[in-house]
Amino acid sequence: AKLNAIDAGIAAQTIQLAAYTRDLGCCIFLSFDPRKIREVLGIPENLEPLLVLALGFQKEVRRVETVGADGSVKYWRDAQGVHHVPKRPLEDLLIIKK
């Protein structure tokens, strides 16, 4: 259960990083209907889909940016169609004890 989710996350990130090195886009989805995924892909009931990966050639321009002063991590598109993806800085996410 919990370890399966951790392993799935590690595998998904590895696939995403490998895709990036080959100029492919990859998006990890956690919001999906597991019953529909089982039905469409023929996955047996004893297996639980934990995430979905979309993988392919990118059609959009995406910019990963530092979160603004308002603290919002909501994605948005500008007038030119650029997909802005605000992320917290690494320093805010790591706990380093000295």
Can you say where each PLM-predicted feature lies in the sequence?
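Acidic, surface-exposed loops and disordered segments
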Residues: 1-98
